[in-house]
């Protein structure tokens, strides 16, 4: 049976220096070893020496979208000025928690920005490749752009629930009903295609 896991908080006294030597996530003061992190207490000893006392965090640090990063996101809502999205991946790394992002009307494509209509570019539920252009505003939204040929909608479903196929840079078609819908279609690069 495994020994019970002991959790500790920063500043908690773990043991005296006669019982162990300090490891990562700890510091010494007045002959005692203290925790410098919130995490699990670990003791490891080799060859009968004093055990090394360390504190290890449970989870690794959260990956964050950075300016210039290519992200995969899902459209949650749209209006005439922008599309709201949830960022799910940074590059090919999945995020533990999704982040909110916004694709503004003027950031949808590089040309004819004044003619862009959000509802002809994205729909709720679409999976979109986008690039982070700013870390956002007071609502903690990341500002994203799809103003490159390689960025835009990569997966979309028709009203009948069938995954659509891109037929041009601005249209996708349902293979079952053959209805066409407008989207800002991404030209997916070969390295992102799964075989």
Curated annotation (Swiss-Prot):
Record carries keyword rRNA processing: yes
GO CC term, one of those recorded: cytoplasm
Alphabetical keyword list: Cytoplasm, Disease variant, Exosome, Neurodegeneration, Nucleus, Phosphoprotein, RNA-binding, rRNA processing
Family matches, as SMART domains: S1
GO molecular function, one term: RNA binding
Subcellular location: Nucleus, Nucleolus; Nucleus; Cytoplasm
UniProt cross-references to Gene3D superfamilies, sorted A to Z: 2.40.50.100, Nucleic acid-binding proteins
Phosphoserine: modified positions: 21, 98
S1 motif domain sequence ranges: 66-147
GO biological process, one term: RNA processing
Pfam families: ECR1_N (PF14382), EXOSC1 (PF10447)
Coiled-coil positions: none
Quaternary structure and interacting proteins, as annotated: Component of the RNA exosome core complex (Exo-9), composed of EXOSC1, EXOSC2, EXOSC3, EXOSC4, EXOSC5, EXOSC6, EXOSC7, EXOSC8 and EXOSC9; within the complex interacts with EXOSC6. The catalytically inactive RNA exosome core complex (Exo-9) associates with the catalytic subunit EXOSC10/RRP6. Exo-9 may associate with DIS3 to form the nucleolar exosome complex, or DIS3L to form the cytoplasmic exosome complex. Exo-9 is formed by a hexameric base ring consisting of the heterodimers EXOSC4-EXOSC9, EXOSC5-EXOSC8 and EXOSC6-EXOSC7, and a cap ring consisting of EXOSC1, EXOSC2 and EXOSC3.
Described purpose of this protein according to its UniProt entry: Non-catalytic component of the RNA exosome complex which has 3'->5' exoribonuclease activity and participates in a multitude of cellular RNA processing and degradation events. In the nucleus, the RNA exosome complex is involved in proper maturation of stable RNA species such as rRNA, snRNA and snoRNA, in the elimination of RNA processing by-products and non-coding 'pervasive' transcripts, such as antisense RNA species and promoter-upstream transcripts (PROMPTs), and of mRNAs with processing defects, thereby limiting or excluding their export to the cytoplasm.
Membership in a protein family: Belongs to the CSL4 family.
Disease involvement: Pontocerebellar hypoplasia 1F: A form of pontocerebellar hypoplasia, a disorder characterized by structural defects of the pons and cerebellum, evident upon brain imaging. PCH1F is an autosomal recessive form characterized by hypotonia, global developmental delay, poor overall growth, and dysmorphic facial features. Brain imaging shows pontocerebellar hypoplasia, thin corpus callosum, cerebral atrophy, and delayed myelination.
Protein name per the record: Exosome complex component CSL4
This protein's encoding gene: EXOSC1
């Amino acid at each position: 049976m495994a020994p019970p896991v002991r959790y500790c908080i920063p500043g908690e006294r773990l043991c005296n220096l006669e019982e162990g030597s300090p490891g990562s996530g700890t510091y010494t003061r007045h002959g005692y070893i203290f925790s410098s992190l919130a995490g699990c207490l670990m003791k490891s000893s080799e060859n009968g020496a004093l055990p090394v006392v360390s504190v290890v965090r449970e989870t690794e640090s959260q990956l964050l979208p950075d300016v210039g990063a290519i992200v995969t996101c899902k459209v949650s809502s749209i209006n005439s000025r922008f599309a709201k999205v949830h960022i799910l991946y940074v590059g090919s790394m999945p995020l533990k928690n999704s982040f909110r992002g916004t694709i503004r009307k003027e950031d949808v494509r590089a040309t004819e920005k004044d003619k862009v209509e959000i509802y002809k570019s994205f729909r709720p539920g679409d999976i979109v490749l986008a690039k982070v252009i700013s870390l956002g505003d007071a609502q903690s939204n990341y500002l994203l752009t799809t103003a490159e040929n390689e960025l835009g909608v990569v997966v979309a479903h028709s009203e009948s629930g069938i995954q659509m196929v891109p037929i041009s840079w601005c249209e996708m078609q349902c293979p079952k009903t053959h209805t066409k819908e407008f989207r800002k279609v991404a030209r997916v690069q070969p390295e992102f295609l799964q075989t």
